[in-house]
């Protein structure tokens, strides 16, 4: 006499399915954490920055210098933006054509103002949010007879938040100068985030440039930086004390 095979109850099948789903989610989450940890951007404390272009203009004691500082919002935070960090609903706040148009207009305004030193923040080099447009290269051509330097402060292979996610980030700050710099360097600032949030967040820095002042043995030092926009003050004070 053969015994009949026992049938699994619907409840057991249900719990098994739930277990498999939870296991898949856990494995995917662990894989994501491992990926963003392994690909985390870890800049040195101090890094020498390459100088692009070739300016021959010097500076001497008593000269007047015109300066401009501009957070361009990676060419995508114009009057049409509905950005989630400002209480809006969108991650991608502009079309690709709008970003291109904005960067072109920004370059035009820099040429019009013609500053000796232009410090720009939130400049994307290869980011999903600005359609991977190399804004550094385009803005670096804004003025003839100038040079520029770029310091990265946000690099992540994949930023998993919000929904839809930000994705790839490669952004920073840049300085365009008519004055010939004898050096430029990136100096890291303290990171206010802990692991794992730190792995996909900004690594803020100072972009420090130096130009010799003729006949004095001294230097003109100009520092570009971009601090927290959504900080209540503690993080900014910590970095300024640094």
What are these regions (language model features)?
Residues 66, 135, 170-174, 203-207, ...:
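Short beta-strand micro-motifs in enzyme catalytic cores
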Residues 89-95, 123-125, 189-199, 227-237:
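Surface-exposed cleft-lining segments at the edges of enzyme active sites
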Residues 80-89, 183, 223-228:
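Short, basic/glycine-rich phosphate-binding loops at helix/coil junctions
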Residues 215-242:
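Flexible, glycine-rich surface segments
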Residues 8-161, 165-170, 237-240:
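N-terminal, active-site-proximal structural segment of metallo-dependent hydrolase catalytic domains
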Residues 141-144, 167-184, 211-212:
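Conserved beta strand-loop-helix elements of the APE1-like EEP
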Residues 179-220:
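Active-site catalytic loop in hydrolytic enzyme cores
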Residues 72-75, 124-126, 154-156, 179-182, ...:
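Short, solvent-exposed loop/turn segments at secondary-structure junctions
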